[in-house]
Curated annotation (Swiss-Prot):
Stated name of the protein: AA9 family lytic polysaccharide monooxygenase A
Alphabetic keyword roster: Carbohydrate metabolism, Cellulose degradation, Copper, Disulfide bond, Glycoprotein, Metal-binding, Monooxygenase, Oxidoreductase, Polysaccharide degradation, Secreted, Signal
Example GO BP: cellulose catabolic process
Biased composition (Low complexity): 266-276, 291-304
UniProt GO molecular function: cellulase activity; cellulose binding; metal ion binding; monooxygenase activity
Free-text comment about domains: Has a modular structure: an endo-beta-1,4-glucanase catalytic module at the N-terminus, a linker rich in serines and threonines, and a C-terminal carbohydrate-binding module (CBM). The CBM domain is essential for binding to and subsequent oxidative degradation of polysaccharide substrate.
Localization: Secreted
Composition-biased stretches (Acidic residues): 279-290
Stretch list, region Disordered: 266-316
Glycosylated residue positions: 327
Cofactor needs: Cu(2+)
EC number(s) per entry: 1.14.99.56
């Protein structure tokens, strides 16, 4: 009997350790900026990958240690495509990103650095929830941990991007939803005219009783109420896409995943029905057994020119690569069986028809 209990405990611990995720790198216009999840990087990273479950916690702003600046700030311009890269442990091809049971929405907020770090001025600039039987997290896993936004046409200055996952596998009980977030340090070098609105406070934007936080993914439903404020209508006013800049002085770290991917890509087959088994060990924050991400090499700061999308001998664009968008000058005809899907005005992508 003791042996049986021991095996069950080990299985639960292993399952629990494979549940969680952090943002470990970003890409700018398809160029890998290298690992940023360290004190010498550009992401204000927590000490481990544990989620937050108390929506009133001060750590909801930028996660644990999120008030502490890190060494680097990445230069970006209006119209740049920013891709966030999430992982469970590290950036290796074998990493499982986040447990597939952790279905839920993904959102991105933006705030001026000083104001945002104090928990104020957060403006939602992107969100993805539930559509056609798939959750944003399903698409994130299929896309090897990547989802993208476009930099709005805001005034020049220092800003924080705050990508966030809400895992709802225990959202059927009050206080069970799990929140994962980090803050990425950027400096907008273009000088746009669309100043951010007043925004919301985080903590403060969510309540444990919000329909999109206290939500049962295992019962029948046809839609999902996104939590928090609406997406800012100025988020789509991103100005002109940037011209290529000089290559980085250091060779960027390149992963096996494609370099130009948006959030809604390469879907996996999922349903709203309950899975055969769910995590039984995800509860209060202090109870998690987690793994601290392995140290990564320091990041580069200057983006390089975007590589053209791979093409067939006929000149058509392969699946998952860019086929259009504002200021895009490459091939626009997708391979047979694919269509050019517009995700936003700056990024169109070849996907299966």
């Amino acid at each position: 009997m003791k042996s049986t209990f021991g095996l069950l405990a080990l299985a639960a611990a292993a399952k629990m350790a494979h549940a969680h995720a952090t943002v470990q790198a970003i890409w700018i216009n398809g160029v890998d900026q290298g690992a940023g999840n360290s004190a010498s990087g550009y992401i204000r990273s927590p000490p481990n990958n544990s989620p937050l479950v108390d929506v009133t916690s001060a750590d909801m702003t930028c996660n644990v240690n999120g008030k502490n600046p890190v060494a680097k700030t990445l230069p970006v311009k209006a119209g740049d495509k920013i891709t966030f890269e999430w992982h469970h442990t590290d950036r290796s091809p074998s990493d499982d990103i986040i447990a597939s049971s952790h279905r839920g929405p993904i959102m991105v907020y933006m705030a001026p650095t000083a104001k945002g770090a104090a928990g104020n001025g957060w403006v939602k600039i992107a969100e993805e929830g539930y559509s056609n039987g798939k959750w944003a997290v399903d698409n994130l896993i299929a896309n090897r941990g990547k989802h993208s936004i476009v930099v709005p046409d805001v005034p020049a200055g220092d800003y924080l991007f705050r990508p966030e996952i809400i895992a709802l596998h225990e959202g059927n009980r009050l206080g069970g939803a799990q929140f994962y977030m980090e803050c990425v340090q950027v400096k907008v070098t273009s000088n746009g005219a669309n100043a951010l609105p007043a925004g919301v406070s985080i903590p403060g934007a969510y309540k444990a009783t919000d329909p999109g936080v206290h939500f049962d993914i295992y019962n029948s439903f046809s839609s999902y109420p996104m939590p928090g404020p609406a997406v800012w209508n100025g988020a789509s006013a991103a100005g002109s896409a940037p011209a290529p800049t000089a290559a980085p002085t250091q060779k960027p770290v390149v992963t096996a995943a494609p370099t130009t991917l948006a959030t809604l890509v390469k879907p996996t087959t999922t349903t709203a029905a309950a899975p055969a088994e769910t995590d039984s060990c995800d509860g209060d924050d202090d109870d998690y057994e987690t793994e601290t991400p392995a140290p990564q090499a320091s990041a580069t700061q200057a983006p390089a020119p975007q590589r053209p999308a791979p093409q067939t001998p006929s000149g058509s664009v392969k699946e998952w690569y860019q086929c259009g968008g504002i200021n895009y000058t490459g091939a626009k005809n997708c391979e047979s069986g694919l269509v050019c899907k517009e995700w936003n005005p700056y990024y169109h992508q070849c996907i299966k028809a």
